[in-house]
Amino acid sequence: MDSDTILREARLIKNLKHSHIPVIYDIEEDDISICIIEEYISGKSLRSYINNTDNIKTSEICDIAVKLCDILEYLHNCDNEIIHLDIKPDNIIIDEHNNVKLIDFGSSIHKAGLTQAGMISPGYAAPEQYGGKELTYQTDIYSVGMVLKFMADSNSTVHNKLYPVINKCTRHNQYRRYKNVKALRWELEQTARSDITFSRK
């Protein structure tokens, strides 16, 4: 990551106030170097967490995704209307209290409708991120769907009601995905409840 990208990311995060986004305490720069004082985020990446968790339940998968949706709802509705554009298991941290943290804003942009894109993560990037197409909040929703798929595929006993949610998130046409993360979160909450009910039978 070049110095301009690092500085842009730091300035972007510094203006955000959310408990599950890293805090930038200070940015110091001169002609030679950049010094960024940032909150240390402890925990495991979601990839590591899933790889070291046996038989994760559908309700837990939904809980992680709901917490991620809470962060994205804040980003999408803040003054700068931020689209993250690099949601993947490596950029999601699970701390010791099972809180979900979102890191790496190097590819993020202000406001929906722009076509600028930074680094693309194959397997998690939406189709519109390739080829300079319009980027919207549904671009992030696609990536959430792929993260859901990553978690669901780790356990063959995952409740099959989760897969229709994944399929809607990852539709090729972004305007046929969930309208916003609030709608996606509601669907995840319903799926989690049905899984708990199913487990009790």
Which residues are covered by each model-predicted region?
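AlphaC helix of the eukaryotic protein kinase fold
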Residues: M1-N15
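Conserved catalytic-loop aspartate of Hanks-type protein kinases
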Residues: D140
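Catalytic-loop of the protein kinase fold
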Residues: H76-I94
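Activation-segment/catalytic-loop signature of the eukaryotic protein kinase fold
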Residues: I27
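Activation segment signature within eukaryotic-like protein kinase domains
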Residues: I64-A65
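Conserved activation segment of eukaryotic-like protein kinases, specifically the C-terminal portion
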Residues: T115-E128
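Conserved short submotifs of the Hanks-type protein kinase catalytic core
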Residues: D31-S45
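AlphaC helix of the protein kinase catalytic domain
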Residues: L46-I56
